[in-house]
Amino acid sequence: INVRAKDKACVDFALHAMVTYIMDSIFDEIEDFPRRGISSIKIFMAYNGSPLHVDDGTFFRILEKSRQVGATVFVHAENGEILNFLRSECVKKGQLTPHYHYVSRPPFTEAEAVRRAIYLAGQTDTPLYIAHMTCREAIAELQKAKGTGQRVSGETCTHYLTTTKEVLDNPDFNEAAKFVCSPALRDQEDCEALWQALAGGLLTA
């Protein structure tokens, strides 16, 4: 990309990396980020058992290495172990409709992961960007961290501002499935909390 953009790009741009298939060599690659124009790296606390998942030890190492090179760490914050358990419980009970996507991804699993990510980033003094925040419990964790002066930012998405979990109850499976996303859609009180956080500058994207 940098080769193709050289002498052609008319705007400033940066590249965004994502960790998959954890191996020791990725930490050497992070050291090369500045030269390659990569200013941020995204990790997933969810999706345990998949190549996307990053455990806490690896997350901590990525935070340390990112701080050393001046990169911001983006995080998808959900407690993957609890999500796997809740999903397996739904499957055992035959609860397979889109409604149970929300049941298996409750707000506390996001809030706990947000709190943990903030704490680990604080221990390494690494800038943290919390992607697609959805619930008031997670917003409260962000507010506490920013109140201490920690370098942490939060974003949300349009669908979390405008759509609530009730759409997952549509009896038409195909229609309800259109609204399956992770983290899951929340309730009206969460929508309102997100709007307030945006209006007050707590959420910045």
Regions found by a protein language model. Name each.
Residues 4-26, 43-50:
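Metal-cofactor-binding active-site regions of metalloenzymes
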